[in-house]
């Protein structure tokens, strides 16, 4: 029994001595406080790294879950195009030349689209043909309600092609200048097209009217049999009546003109006028004018 007790006491003493040795080492060792270092302090940086990794993995899982839910809610396939090819080229140029000032959120705000659309544009390397560009731009502009601006894309300015045959023009194109210009900046172009069409349709009517006027003038200049004693009056009046009819007025000689003729030829001029059908003569038989 004594042996066992001595062994137990010896073991306790050794343990106490070892503890005292660790304590003395901790006191004598370098350190500002002089206390025993915490063994868990060596694991703090590793725990922080593990926590950061766990948080990043958690965020990634949440993002993946959000993407899955959004794909299920959205329609299948690519989203509808809302940008023209010119706008997409401008987005790529700005992001490539000025990446700091034109970031993805800034581009999305400037072009009024989502950030996903900007990322799709930046990732895409597809180069379509000119026909494909025009076709896709036409769809985009039709959805945006700007079909009239296709003339700027084609560069030809042939706006008459945009108006098919028999197309009824809306009332907004025929509004007064100030009101139409405030609502539609391209109303002048549409009015020009309409005016050109109406000019073409009215051209035959104008030609017929002019031909009729010329025919009337030719009939008015048909020589009339006058007395041989007065060729001078006939020649003079024909030259005088030619000037007002040449202007296209078609008016009859005024009273002032008749007074001038009377003053020039007082002997041969008579104030009495005789009507024979559509022709008018004086009392001496001289031809005056025709209706």
Curated annotation (Swiss-Prot):
It holds the Pfam family Neugrin. InterPro entries: NGRN/Rrg9. Glycans are attached at residues 158, 186, 268. GO terms for cellular component: extracellular region; intercellular bridge; mitochondrial matrix; mitochondrial membrane; mitochondrion; mitotic spindle; nuclear body; nucleoplasm. GO terms for biological process: mitochondrial ribosome assembly; neuron differentiation; positive regulation of mitochondrial translation. The modification Phosphoserine is found at residue 41. Expressed at high levels in heart, brain and skeletal muscle. In brain, mainly expressed in neurons rather than glial cells. It comes from the Eukaryota. Residues 236-246 have a biased composition (Polar residues). GO terms for molecular function: RNA binding; rRNA binding. Residues 1-15 form the signal peptide. It is found in: Nucleus; Secreted; Mitochondrion membrane. Residues 26-48, 155-270 are annotated as: Disordered. Induction: Highly up-regulated in neuroblastostoma cells by retinoic acid treatment inducing neurite outgrowth. Keywords: Developmental protein, Differentiation, Glycoprotein, Membrane, Mitochondrion, Nucleus, Phosphoprotein, Secreted, Signal. Forms a regulatory protein-RNA complex, consisting of RCC1L, NGRN, RPUSD3, RPUSD4, TRUB2, FASTKD2 and 16S mt-rRNA. Interacts with 16S mt-rRNA; this interaction is direct. Plays an essential role in mitochondrial ribosome biogenesis. As a component of a functional protein-RNA module, consisting of RCC1L, NGRN, RPUSD3, RPUSD4, TRUB2, FASTKD2 and 16S mitochondrial ribosomal RNA (16S mt-rRNA), controls 16S mt-rRNA abundance and is required for intra-mitochondrial translation of core subunits of the oxidative phosphorylation system. Belongs to the neugrin family. This is Neugrin. It comes from Homo sapiens (Human).
């Amino acid at each position: 029994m004594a042996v066992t007790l001595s062994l137990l006491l010896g073991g306790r003493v050794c343990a106490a001595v070892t503890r005292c040795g660790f304590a003395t080492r901790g006191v004598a060792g370098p350190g500002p406080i002089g206390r025993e270092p915490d063994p868990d302090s060596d694991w703090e940086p590793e725990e922080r790294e593990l926590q950061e990794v766990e948080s990043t993995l958690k965020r990634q899982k949440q993002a993946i879950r959000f993407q899955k839910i959004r794909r299920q809610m959205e329609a299948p396939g690519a989203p509808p195009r809302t940008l023209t090819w010119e706008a997409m080229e401008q987005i790529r140029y700005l992001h490539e030349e000025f990446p700091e000032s034109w970031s993805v959120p800034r581009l999305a705000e400037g072009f009024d689209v989502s950030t996903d659309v900007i990322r799709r544009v930046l990732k895409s390397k597809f180069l379509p043909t000119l026909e494909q560009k025009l076709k896709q731009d036409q769809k985009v502009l039709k959805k945006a309600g700007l079909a009239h601006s296709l003339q700027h894309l084609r560069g030809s300015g042939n706006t008459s092609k945009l108006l098919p045959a028999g197309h009824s023009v809306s009332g907004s194109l025929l509004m007064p200048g100030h009101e139409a210009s405030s609502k539609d900046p391209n109303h002048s172009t549409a009015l020009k097209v309409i005016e050109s069409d109406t000019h073409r349709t009215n051209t035959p009517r104008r030609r017929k009217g002019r031909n009729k006027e010329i025919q009337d003038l030719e009939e008015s200049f048909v020589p009339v049999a006058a007395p041989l004693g007065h060729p001078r009056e006939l020649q003079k009046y024909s030259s005088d009546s030619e000037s007002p009819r040449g202007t296209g007025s078609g008016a009859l000689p005024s009273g002032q003109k008749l007074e001038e003729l009377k003053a020039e030829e007082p002997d041969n001029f008579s104030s009495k006028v005789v009507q024979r059908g559509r022709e008018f003569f004086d009392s001496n038989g001289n031809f005056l004018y025709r209706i």
